[in-house]
């Protein structure tokens, strides 16, 4: 950029990477190519595009200039060769796993997963001959012991939704390379501003870009980043032929607008969450708190090794179980009772009855999701107002 070979900083790339206004009539903001199809100057040119011999667009389910800019920008931020934009986080996850797995293959999974990911695996792809096993991705000995010749993919979230359990990403990647398995990491909670799994050895990163990347709660979107070869496979197999989960150009433009302020928003999310977590840790109504920024967090050292900041998500368990959790939730006034996360607004949800309702009670207990667990997505409001709301809700929960 500007004649320098030095890689620009994160914020600079989030705003400028891959776009030159002079290539687009001087437009400061990238144009939106709101078109389904593209014309060819000749039949021969079109044939070359279809054969992959000529760079070009022919149908927006496969590629679109607006989406391609978003994809290049996300690849730069994650430190990957290529990116792929999709219609939702589940579009990204399903397109990726349908591409990588075949009947008879095995996928090793983190113990705790987002509820819809869990449902897709256990009630979707798992019914087509793909073997599923859950492993603690922080226990590298257990992971090594679980590997078999059929293991094709290792998939996990770090931190995990909703209990914040972390994986040793570099350690997992080292084991996977030895066995020829592909490592896929859901980096939604962190974004590339806080954690870059590809730099730790992962092969692919997936995001629900609906969350922090967008940051405004007004679109659904998904992202995949990895090597050019893997991303091309997912584009031409998982997206084009299997899910069709294409992101609209308009939503891609909104997502790029959100990414421009990602670093500023994440700094604020993290700062607010740290103060709120420290407050919760002192409250008599709280049985247990899960937040990577607290020294009491069991994986505090690992968090400091692979994350630059502890993030904006907090999970905690109230004394009194599910009844206390419901009373707390219903008493909130500033926090909104809603699924999703990463918005400017602070959100609260009860996993047992919301995002992880696809788990049985026994599965939730097995994977560390108690009936009284509350998850907070700490927003950008003034911290004093957030503290006051949580304090009065805690009193109501007792």
From Swiss-Prot:
<comment type="similarity">
    <text>Belongs to the trans-sulfuration enzymes family. L-methionine gamma-lyase subfamily.</text>
</comment>
<keyword id="KW-0456">Lyase</keyword>
<dbReference type="InterPro" id="IPR006237">
    <property type="entry name" value="L-Met_gamma_lys"/>
</dbReference>
<dbReference type="Pfam" id="PF01053">
    <property type="entry name" value="Cys_Met_Meta_PP"/>
</dbReference>
<protein>
    <recommendedName>
        <fullName>L-methionine gamma-lyase</fullName>
        <ecNumber>4.4.1.11</ecNumber>
        <ecNumber>4.4.1.2</ecNumber>
    </recommendedName>
</protein>
<dbReference type="GO" id="GO:0018826">
    <property type="term" value="F:methionine gamma-lyase activity"/>
</dbReference>
<dbReference type="InterPro" id="IPR000277">
    <property type="entry name" value="Cys/Met-Metab_PyrdxlP-dep_enz"/>
</dbReference>
<feature type="binding site">
    <location>
        <position position="114"/>
    </location>
    <ligand>
        <name>substrate</name>
    </ligand>
</feature>
<dbReference type="GO" id="GO:0005737">
    <property type="term" value="C:cytoplasm"/>
</dbReference>
<feature type="binding site">
    <location>
        <begin position="59"/>
        <end position="61"/>
    </location>
    <ligand>
        <name>pyridoxal 5'-phosphate</name>
    </ligand>
</feature>
<feature type="binding site">
    <location>
        <position position="375"/>
    </location>
    <ligand>
        <name>substrate</name>
    </ligand>
</feature>
<dbReference type="InterPro" id="IPR015424">
    <property type="entry name" value="PyrdxlP-dep_Trfase"/>
</dbReference>
<dbReference type="GO" id="GO:0019346">
    <property type="term" value="P:transsulfuration"/>
</dbReference>
<dbReference type="GO" id="GO:0030170">
    <property type="term" value="F:pyridoxal phosphate binding"/>
</dbReference>
<dbReference type="InterPro" id="IPR015421">
    <property type="entry name" value="PyrdxlP-dep_Trfase_major"/>
</dbReference>
<dbReference type="InterPro" id="IPR054542">
    <property type="entry name" value="Cys_met_metab_PP"/>
</dbReference>
<feature type="modified residue" description="N6-(pyridoxal phosphate)lysine">
    <location>
        <position position="211"/>
    </location>
</feature>
<dbReference type="InterPro" id="IPR015422">
    <property type="entry name" value="PyrdxlP-dep_Trfase_small"/>
</dbReference>
<dbReference type="GO" id="GO:0047982">
    <property type="term" value="F:homocysteine desulfhydrase activity"/>
</dbReference>
<comment type="subunit">
    <text>Homotetramer; dimer of active dimers.</text>
</comment>
<keyword id="KW-0663">Pyridoxal phosphate</keyword>
<comment type="function">
    <text>Catalyzes the alpha,gamma-elimination of L-methionine to produce methanethiol, 2-oxobutanoate and ammonia. Is involved in L-methionine catabolism. In fact, shows a multicatalytic function since it also catalyzes gamma-replacement of L-methionine with thiol compounds, alpha,gamma-elimination and gamma-replacement reactions of L-homocysteine and its S-substituted derivatives, O-substituted-L-homoserines and DL-selenomethionine, and, to a lesser extent, alpha,beta-elimination and beta-replacement reactions of L-cysteine, S-methyl-L-cysteine, and O-acetyl-L-serine.</text>
</comment>
<feature type="binding site" description="in other chain">
    <location>
        <begin position="208"/>
        <end position="210"/>
    </location>
    <ligand>
        <name>pyridoxal 5'-phosphate</name>
    </ligand>
</feature>
<feature type="binding site" description="in other chain">
    <location>
        <begin position="89"/>
        <end position="90"/>
    </location>
    <ligand>
        <name>pyridoxal 5'-phosphate</name>
    </ligand>
</feature>
């Amino acid at each position: 950029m500007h004649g320098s070979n030095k890689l620009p900083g994160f914020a600079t790339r989030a705003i400028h990477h891959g776009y030159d206004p002079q290539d687009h009539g001087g437009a400061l903001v990238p144009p939106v190519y709101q078109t389904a199809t593209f014309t060819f100057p000749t039949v021969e040119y079109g044939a070359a595009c279809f054969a992959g011999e000529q760079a070009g667009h022919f149908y927006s389910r496969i590629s679109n200039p607006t989406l391609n800019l978003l994809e290049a920008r996300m690849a730069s931020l994650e430190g990957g060769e290529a990116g792929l934009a999709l219609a939702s986080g589940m579009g990204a996850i399903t397109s990726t796993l349908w591409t990588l797995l075949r009947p008879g293959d095995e996928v090793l999974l983190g113990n705790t997963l987002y509820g819809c990911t869990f449902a897709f695996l256990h009630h979707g792809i798992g019914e087509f001959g793909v073997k599923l096993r859950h492993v603690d991705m922080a226990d590298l000995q257990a992971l090594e012991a679980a590997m078999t010749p059929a293991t094709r993919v290792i998939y996990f979230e770090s931190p995990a939704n909703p209990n914040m359990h972390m994986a040793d990403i570099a350690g997992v990647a080292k084991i996977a390379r030895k066995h020829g398995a592909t490592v896929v990491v859901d980096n939604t909670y962190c974004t590339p501003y806080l954690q870059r799994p590809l730099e730790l050895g992962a092969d692919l990163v997936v995001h629900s870009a609906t969350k922090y990347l967008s940051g405004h709660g007004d679109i659904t979107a998904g992202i995949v980043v990895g090597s050019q070869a893997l991303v091309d496979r997912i584009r031409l197999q998982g997206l084009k032929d299997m899910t069709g989960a294409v992101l609209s150009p308009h939503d891609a433009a909104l997502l790029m607008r959100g990414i421009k302020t990602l670093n500023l928003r994440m700094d604020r999310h993290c700062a607010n969450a740290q103060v709120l977590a420290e407050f919760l840790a002192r409250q008599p109504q709280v049985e247990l708190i899960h937040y990577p920024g607290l020294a009491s967090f069991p994986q505090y050292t690992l968090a400091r090794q692979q994350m630059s900041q502890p993030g904006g998500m907090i999970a905690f368990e109230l004394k009194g179980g599910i009844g206390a959790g419901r009373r707390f939730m219903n008493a909130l006034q500033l926090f909104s009772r809603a699924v999703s996360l990463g918005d400017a607004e602070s959100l609260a949800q009860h996993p047992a009855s919301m995002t992880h309702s696809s788990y049985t009670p026994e599965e939730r207990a097995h994977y560390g999701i108690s009936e009284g667990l509350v998850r907070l997505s700490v927003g950008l409001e003034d911290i004093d107002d957030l503290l006051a709301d949580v304090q009065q809700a805690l009193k109501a929960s007792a």
